């Protein structure tokens, strides 16, 4: 029933769901596409001419890590160093509905009302396209490989994006 309601609610949009392990940069990537890093910039971009996207929480599974408001009153996905997002949340940009999700492998926190990974798995089939983020500092995690195999097996349209490759760590 929830799936039917979700599909009906979002049917006139291209639904892109971003998911991946904790610390892979899902919310940061969403905020980038929504224009967070351009709206106050001196760089002239299309974001200056558009209405700011409306951010909405679809389903929350914890009391923290949903949407947050900056000092200018603009709403964005909450970003943090690890295991921050606790909701299925989205914004709409023209005909695109960008869905942010909790990290796979998220640890249960006190007060969680649902398992974060179960929530992610429930919403994957509803997306027109899944963008699966892999953190370059943790390549080849078994869980990541399982998700890539699942996407392939189920015929889910998907892209794999390697994140944080611009950050060099000294060993």
Give the location of each predicted region:
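Flexible beta-alpha connector loops of hexameric P-loop NTPases
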Residues: 104-112
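Short, basic, glycine/proline-bearing loop/turn elements
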Residues: 71-72, 101-105, 130-135
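Conserved G1/Walker A P-loop phosphate-binding module
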Residues: 1-101
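Residue-level marker of regulatory loop/turn positions in helix-turn-helix DNA-binding domains and
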Residues: 8, 112, 140
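Short catalytic/ligand-binding loop motif for oxyanion handling, primarily in non-cytosolic enzymes
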Residues: 25, 107, 168-169
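Conserved C-terminal guanine-recognition region of P-loop GTPase G domains, centered on the G4
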Residues: 90, 95-96, 118-171
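Conserved Walker B
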Residues: 22, 102-104, 136-137, 165
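Short secondary-structure boundary/capping elements
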Residues: 83, 111-119, 143
